[in-house]
Regions:
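Structured adenosyl-cofactor binding patch, chiefly the S-adenosyl-L-methionine
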Residues: 123, 127-174
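S-adenosyl-L-methionine/SAH cofactor-binding core of RNA-modifying enzymes
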Residues: 63-119, 162
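Internal, active-site/partner-interface "lid" segment
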Residues: 148, 160-200
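SAM-dependent methyltransferases
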Residues: 189-268
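Short glycine-enriched loops at secondary-structure junctions
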Residues: 38-41, 119-123
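Short, solvent-exposed amphipathic alpha-helical segments in soluble enzyme
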Residues: 20-24, 105-109, 130-131
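N-terminal nucleotide/polyanion-binding subdomain common to many enzyme families
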Residues: 1-81, 207-230
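Hydrophobic/aromatic beta-strand patches that form the interior of the parallel beta-sheet core
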Residues: 4-6, 34-36, 88-90, 113-114, ...
Length: 268
C-alpha cells in the first residue's frame, strides 16, 4: 500500500512511522509511506502557508496555493465534481465522518491513499472541493492539528493490510472478536500480590480458553459499549453451538458483570 502524508510538521511522524509494526512493514516493502512538507511548496519568501480567513474569524487558515502545488507534485489531479481525482485524498477534519472499524476495513482494501493534515483553523475550502477530498474525524474533540489524527488513521488501516501483522494476529483481527472489545489478558507470574490468573487460561484446554475469551469480550462490550454489542449481535453469527449458547445467555440477561475468574450473573 502506498500512503502519502502531507503536513506542515513531518518531524512529528518520525517515531510513529519508523518503529515497531509500521517500521517493519516498510522495510519489507508492504507499506510505502512518504512524508511531504507542505511549506516547501509555498511561493512566499518566508515559506508562509497560512493567512487570515475572508469574512473574519478566529485564527489562521492554510492557503490553497501550497496545498494545490503539493498535491499536484505527488501526482494528484483534481477538477471535482466534473472530474474524478486521480488519487483518493483524505483530509483529517473535525467535521468529517467519525472513523470506525468498518471504514478502516474499506480503506485497508485500497492500494493508494493521500492524507492531508490540516492545522490552525483548517484549510481553504477550495482545496476540499477541487480534489474531492474525503473528510475524516477521529472523534468529537479538538486537536491542535491533523497530524495525530493521521497517525491514528495510518496505524489502524495498516494493521489490516495483509502481511503487516503476523499470521496469528491477522487471523485474530478477522475472527469472531471483530466488533467486540478485547478480553482481559495476563502474563507471568500466575500469582502476583494475591491476584491469580484465571485458572482456565493455564489449564491447556484450548477450546475452553477460546470460549472464555469470547465470553469476556461479550461481557465487556455489553457493559461498556452497548452500541457495539447491538451491532455485533445484528451483523455477526456465532461460529458454533458453544459460542451461540454463550451469546444467547447474554441476549437474555439484563446485566452481566465481569470477574477475573470468569463471568457471573449479578442477579445470582
Amino acid at each position: 500500500m502506498k500512503i502519502d502524508i502531507l503536513t506542515l510538521f513531518p518531524e512529528m511522524f518520525e517515531a510513529t512511522l519508523g518503529g515497531s509494526i509500521l517500521g517493519r512493514a516498510q522495510e519489507k516493502g508492504i507499506l510505502d509511506i512518504k512524508l511531504t512538507n507542505i511549506r516547501d511548496y509555498s511561493k512566499d519568501k518566508h515559506s508562509k502557508a497560512d493567512d487570515y480567513p475572508f469574512g473574519g474569524g478566529a485564527g489562521m487558515l492554510m492557503l490553497a496555493q501550497p496545498i494545490f502545488d503539493c498535491l499536484e507534485a505527488i501526482g494528484v489531479t483534481g477538477g471535482a465534481p466534473e472530474k474524478k481525482p486521480s488519487r483518493h485524498v483524505i483530509y483529517m477534519s473535525p467535521r468529517g465522518r467519525v472513523l470506525d472499524q468498518s471504514r478502516i476495513r474499506e480503506l485497508a482494501s485500497e492500494q493508494d491513499l493521500v492524507i492531508l493534515c490540516g492545522h490552525y483553523e483548517g484549510i481553504d475550502q477550495r482545496c476540499i472541493d477541487y480534489f474531492g477530498m474525503e473528510e475524516i474525524s477521529i472523534g468529537d474533540y479538538v486537536l491542535t492539528g491533523g497530524e495525530l489524527a493521521a497517525m491514528v488513521l495510518v496505524d489502524s488501516v495498516a494493521r489490516l493490510v495483509p502481511g503487516v501483522l503476523s499470521g496469528e494476529d491477522s487471523a485474530m483481527g478477522e475472527s469472531i472478536y471483530s466488533g467486540l472489545l478485547e478480553y482481559p489478558q495476563y502474563t507471568k507470574p500466575r500469582e502476583f500480590r494475591g491476584m491469580e490468573v484465571p485458572e482456565v487460561l493455564t489449564g491447556g484446554n484450548h477450546k475452553l480458553i477460546e470460549l472464555w475469551k469470547y465470553e469476556q469480550s461479550l461481557a465487556l462490550t455489553k457493559e461498556r459499549r452497548p452500541d457495539l454489542f447491538e451491532e455485533y449481535v445484528q451483523n455477526t453469527a456465532a461460529p458454533d453451538k458453544d459460542h451461540k449458547k454463550i451469546l444467547e445467555r447474554y441476549l437474555n440477561s439484563d446485566k452481566m458483570k465481569v470477574y477475573a475468574s470468569g463471568i457471573k450473573d449479578e442477579k445470582e
